[in-house]
Amino acid sequence: MKKIYFLVVICILVGCKKERPEITPIVKKKVPAIILTDERKVEIDTATINVFKSETLKQFYIASENQTVWGNLKKRAFVLLQLEKSEELGLEPEDYKISQLKKFESKVTTLSDKDLAAYDILLTYNFEKYLNHIYKGKLDPKKLYTNWDLDAKEFDVNSVLIKGFNKNKLDSVVENIQPKTQIYKELLKALEIINTFPDDHVKTIEAADKIVLNDTNPALINIKKRLLYWNDMSGKDSLTTIYNQKTFEAVKRFQERHGLASDGVIGVGTIRALNYSKESRKKQIIANLERWRWYPSELAENYFIINIPDYSLNVVESQDTTLVRNVVVGTSKRRTPIITSFLKTVVFNPTWTVPPTILKEDVVPAMKRNRNYLANKNITIYDTSGKVVSPMAWNENKPNNYRYVQSPGSDNSLGLMKILFPNHHSVYLHDTNHRGIFGRNNRSMSSGCVRVENPLELAQHILDVDGNWPQDRIDTIIASKTTMSFKITKKYALYQWYWTAWSKKNQLIFRADIYDLDSDLYDQLRN
């Protein structure tokens, strides 16, 4: 009975937490043979492997001719250490059964052949699970969201692990498969930084009115405690209720780190950010680490990267940031989709066809109130045969029977240009006829497309590869009010992504979670 104790434990562990066993598609690529050393080896009963219902695990042990592989103490110790310190990567060690594995290890010299085989399988299964998680994340974004359009990250975990195993370079495997992106590294640093902060016990800040320099307000005591806690204010402070210059400067530093208007005025947004606890911020960092494992592990040589919650677009060429632009993104109801694509075409003087959502929610109600609504916006109605329909002849009961097209010009909703890229959401980058909004702090205002500040300069930058695009050429095209399209010959990837935390120069940086994704993602990671 004692001999099969650990095998029984394995069966229980596989079924606990109502966790579905990982079912991996059959690996068609031939798995390299595992080079076994002279340490103790035992035969493995394939029935024990089948408990896990994992084709990947089955193929792994076929490569060892169904013998145990982890007889080497150094290799086992390395794997156990990686799983134990997986929390440094924002992962949960118990997801990899670390406690049970350590119990096996503590009795490894006295384990029966059956129990040794059980330990070997459990170690392989959980180490491969860990490798999959650090390469492409624990969760699948396409199962979580309908508007995340990311390419699947393919990973042959058996081949990668076995090659590292045979060359005694398991450490290189762990290092090399993690994302190489700078933001991922900054997030790991952010997790390291936040773990150095003590537990916080500052009370929730309550302030109904804005607080400005030299005001007196009882909320300032807890505000100052928060600023001291987060190191935005240094040294000793009397913790008075007076908003003095020292606190004013600290508030501006805090606001800048959180993407708020750094004007020193303590309003609702600043209070909300100050009220985040250490634990909440740590969860936010962990959620963002997961996202960056979903994204490509390496970025293209030239690319546009949009951070939706930061309302920013950066153009990066050969690892150099060459342009930075403010952007406007979708509202929480009409969210900007997350996309990986490539730039294809610049369109000057674009027309704008009213999309279904805007037609239903905005245009139809407005037309029912005022039949001249579309005419006032220079929008023409066409029937299914392409004939122009007058506003008075428009059938308000069948609005989907028409096409609504806005003529080119500075008043066009897309402004003077748009940049197209392949995607399934009918979105693009474009100018706007409301150019004053880029000065606002909260720019979650569009219907899903991304509006770009000073887009004509951006267009010239990406088109002018051979010096054939001087500014006056663009000016002439714009003045013609004729729609013209030009292929982008230089290769630019487009990364339209979402992240709300990172670090910079050993400082924690956060942004408002405008689509309320962070908390739910963390909960699912820990489910």
Stretches with model-predicted labels:
Residues 12-15:
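C-terminal motif of bacterial Sec signal peptides marking the signal peptidase cleavage site
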Residues 17-60, 128, 148, 165-527:
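Well-ordered beta-sheet/strand-loop patches within structured domains
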Residues 17-153:
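Cationic-aromatic interfacial patches
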Residues 2-7:
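Sec-dependent signal peptide recognition
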Residues 155-157:
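Alpha/beta-hydrolase superfamily serine-hydrolase fold, recognizing
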